[in-house]
């Protein structure tokens, strides 16, 4: 099992935190794991333990910078990903994204020469036809979003998370504890700015050239994802020339929590 080492440093004058583990296959480009909302690189620990790679806390999340003067929009994150990889002297990657880690798809469109393989899991779709889920609509609404953020606690997150996965009950205590341990005003601000800068038309416009992604791509989706319907797995597979879609029965938004074998499927694809 690869040893996971924590790192901290500045990326373009912004403090950043990331985890890194030696690859199970050192002859290929490292895997870059990009997490979603409202979590951190902690999501990827079981993947790092199996396949190695690099998992940053994106700005606004976890232990990375949460400055108030940042835009936290798609352009900002795409530039940050490039700056981060340059900072750690990594040129090409094999990329895995989940939820808002799907910003990596937007980055891949701008940097196709840097991506050798791609896994998309239950990610925000840069495709036509997506309508934001109920919680996102609240966050996108001024004042109401701030009010909802102020009410968020471990208890409310446990209640909300009951719809997130197919297994009865809330998300695992460890995931909720991790999310809430970093859910300060800086993270709340980043989430609100990210959602408010990303109406459906911006998502579709961002991904209008998604067919230009030509690397081997695996699209995995929990069949019971309540936030992003599984039909977007098929939509991504139709739009990306070298992509295959697999719907995961009895799995929700974090499919590997309902079906741990997803971890092996993802790691095998990325390391082969």
Predicted ranges, named:
Residues 213, 219-221:
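Short beta-strand/loop motif that positions the catalytic acidic residue
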Residues 251-260:
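Catalytic histidine-centered segment of alpha/beta-hydrolase-like enzymes
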Residues 21-63:
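Conserved HGGG/HGGXW glycine-rich cap/lid loop of the alpha/beta-hydrolase fold
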Residues 117-147:
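Flexible "cap/lid" loop of the alpha/beta hydrolase fold
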Residues 55-97:
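Active-site loop/oxyanion-hole signature of alpha/beta-hydrolase fold enzymes
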Residues 32-36, 98, 221:
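The conserved beta1-alpha1 loop
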Residues 224-228:
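Acidic catalytic loop of the alpha/beta-hydrolase fold
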């Amino acid at each position: 099992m690869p040893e996971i080492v924590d790192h901290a440093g500045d990326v373009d004058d912004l403090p950043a935190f990331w985890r890194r583990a030696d690859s199970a296959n050192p002859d290929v480009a490292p895997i870059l794991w990009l997490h979603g909302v409202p979590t951190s690189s902690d999501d990827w620990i079981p993947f790092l333990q199996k396949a190695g790679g690099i998992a940053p806390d994106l700005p606004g999340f976890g232990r990375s910078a949460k400055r108030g003067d940042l835009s936290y929009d798609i352009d900002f994150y795409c530039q940050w990903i490039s700056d981060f990889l340059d900072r750690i002297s990594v040129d090409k990657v094999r990329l895995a994204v989940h939820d808002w880690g799907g910003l990596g798809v937007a980055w891949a469109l701008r940097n196709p020469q840097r991506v050798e393989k791609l896994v998309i899991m239950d990610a925000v779709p840069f495709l036509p036809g997506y309508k934001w889920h109920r919680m996102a609509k609240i966050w996108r609404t001024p004042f109401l979003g701030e009010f909802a953020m102020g009410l968020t606690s471990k208890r409310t997150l446990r209640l909300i998370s009951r719809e997130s996965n197919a297994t009865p009950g809330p998300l695992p205590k460890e995931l909720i504890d991790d999310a809430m341990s970093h859910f300060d005003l800086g993270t709340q601000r980043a989430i609100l700015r990210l959602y408010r800068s990303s109406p459906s038309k911006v998502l579709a416009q961002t991904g209008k050239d998604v067919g230009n992604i030509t690397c081997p791509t695996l699209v995995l989706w929990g069949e019971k994802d309540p936030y992003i319907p599984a039909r977007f797995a098929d939509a991504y597979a139709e739009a990306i020339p070298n992509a295959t879609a697999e719907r995961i029965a009895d799995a929700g938004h974090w499919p590997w929590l309902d079906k741990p074998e997803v971890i092996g499927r993802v790691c095998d694809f990325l390391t082969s």
